[in-house]
């Protein structure tokens, strides 16, 4: 497939609430060359961890070498670290459809979910409605909240809402099926606050996280960032209590022990994210071309159509990113067989399912290798 180059669209200042970050719109060949792992493997597992770009690792190494030579203290060190936090926050806002002041830097989707649920102060008389296709990264924090958890089929969430509901907590795209739970419609039709697990949507489809109350993401998946990087978008930061304060929660350091929270969602930052990791994330966010969403949807559609001819596919048509199917043989053995052939996919334990992740970097050859490996 040939991907056409396109002119870089200039965003007028009055149209853009945050900076828009794109690459120089490279070809598919340029993009694939940025990810060395693609030279060897049909890497189809970004739903767990995305491939690392060479520039991501180089940015991390550069920061480590500065620390090695200059130490990790003094004004230059802290100024560089704080500037990197601001840079990454702004870039994430651009990628997630939010304002920088709405973005907290976290370590994972689960981290963000815990921050939200701890700050809501829910009790056993309160209900949280969720779906039956959620990841433990959301389910665990829900049960730790102390509220009653009401679980509904993924297409019946709205019907499960009652007058005791205090929060709806669902994924944007299910980690199991890849299907969209349409959280914007759920929010519009119920009017209740909503916490969205965006782990399988950020970097896969266009996201306007600022339209939700809370939106948590992991950056090592489809955004291809380093491990232990994440973000939480809080639409109205002043309305959520800071229940898990970190060093960055306070605006000033007062000798008398008083506490004034920082402005915006920065008050929810979950501690000191390593500057090398943030530098790597900043570089990773620059790799994604502006045609990433169209390409991801196209390759997922091709993958689904091909698998549907031979297997039971549980992913609905028209989804992007994940394609999940039920194999006719033992999934553990089949995933291992594929790995030995250089095709990386994921088994979903206990469900007799195999999940394929198609990103903007996925090629037709990757899909052919998958199909050949399936026999």
Give the ranges of each region predicted by the language model.
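Intrinsically disordered and other compositionally biased segments
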Residues: 4-5, 22
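Pyridoxal 5′-phosphate
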Residues: 11-375
